[in-house]
Amino acid sequence: MKRIGEIVRATSTVAVARSTDDTVPDLGTALIDENLDDVGSIVDVFGPIERPYLAVIPDGGNTAQLVGRTVYAR
């Protein structure tokens, strides 16, 4: 399980994660949390080259609860 980053913002349709390093995961990468629960999939990468932001389409549920959670690649 590779640590990808932390969710910093969330709306009902998209969450934004900040990458923990300079490695950019592939679009479509499925993300899980520390409990191995599905979080969503990466649909876009934007921002600085160092620690870019990742747009994530959530798998459902209360997306506000995702803020502050660490996410990992499945």
Which residues make up each language-model segment?
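Beta-strand/loop-dominated core regions that host nucleotide or nucleotide-derived cofactor-binding catalytic loops
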Residues: 2, 55-59, 63-74
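Short beta-strand/strand-turn micro-motif
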Residues: 1-56
